[in-house]
Amino acid sequence: MNLNAPFSPQPPLAAEHLPLTLMRLDDWLPINVSGPDAQSYLQGQLTADLPSLAATQHTLCGHCDAQGKLWSSLRLLRRRDGFTYLLRRSVATLQMLELKKYAVFAKASIVSDEGAVLLGVAGAQASEALGALFPRLPDADAPLLQAGRSHLLYMAWPQPRYLLICDDADEAERIFAPLSARARLADSAQWLALDIESGIPLIDEPNCDSFLPQAVNLQALGGISFTKGCYSGQEMVARAKYRGANRRALFWLRGSAERLPHASEDLELRLGDSWRRSGTVLAAQRLADGGVYLQAVLSSDLPADSVLRVRDDARSQLTLSPLPYSTDQQE
């Protein structure tokens, strides 16, 4: 069966209303890094501390330029004989080009895994449905599990959900066939909406090379090591922590809008009877009920009762929603 055919676009649902849902995550791409120098090379490029990454863990992290600005946020794990990271497909070509710049001096191969299939499973009874296909599932204590030709990643927010990296289409079909009989089918938009609810930073091409990792909450999410030593952009990232150079943070907004803003657009903040341009949109989704979810980078000291709107949209109203984690800047 052609796995693309059933995954037709449809408006996303909020996590609290989501039935068992199977998604094909074509808007994300896995990149494999292998070779004798894979770990040491990535250690000098990414914000995470790779030697401390256990085989049962996955982590968010960032890849920065020399000024500490993010080429992309990544989800990193050990896979096969090296590492795999997941990122938004729109930024993959540019990010890989930057990552490969100095790889000529290392025994490390960096290739996109176009043969792999990424699936998402979320919603009511997601654990029970996957448990019928796998003898064990990842959980909060060990959120990464290899099961044959699949790697299963557990994510707790906004409700327990799973991302599956299937080695090939045959493995994806093995999972798809039984699940599709009982699950709602959706495309990447549903997973993106869940990431917005979760406060997981979504860096697409228009926002590439724009933000320090702290500005998209990577420090609050445990995605930055300040003890690992040098990596690309490390000095500027450390300065943002120790000198308070960063005054921005990632927020989840929801409300109404006549139109969806594009990534990199600014919003408008209500100040009395007037509006002032503020912040940068990272991602936006319109839900099935007509409401809007936005992820945006705004001033970190923005009052919790602030009201914003989509630029030049007089009928729009957006308010801040709490994230499922503390935004205190911890390592």
From Swiss-Prot:
GO terms for biological process, alphabetical: iron-sulfur cluster assembly; RNA modification; tRNA processing
Keywords: Cytoplasm, Folate-binding, tRNA processing
Known function: Folate-binding protein involved in regulating the level of ATP-DnaA and in the modification of some tRNAs. It is probably a key factor in regulatory networks that act via tRNA modification, such as initiation of chromosomal replication.
Compartment(s) of residence: Cytoplasm
Presence of keyword Iron-sulfur: no
GO MF: folic acid binding
GO cellular component terms, semicolon-separated: cytoplasm
Disulfide links within the chain: none
Predominant location category: cytoplasm
Protein name, entry field: tRNA-modifying protein YgfZ
Alphabetized InterPro entries for the sequence: GcvT/YgfZ_C, tRNA-modifying_YgfZ, YgfZ/GcvT, YgfZ/GcvT_CS, YgfZ_barrel
First and last residue of the signal peptide: none
Chain sites annotated for binding folate: 28, 191
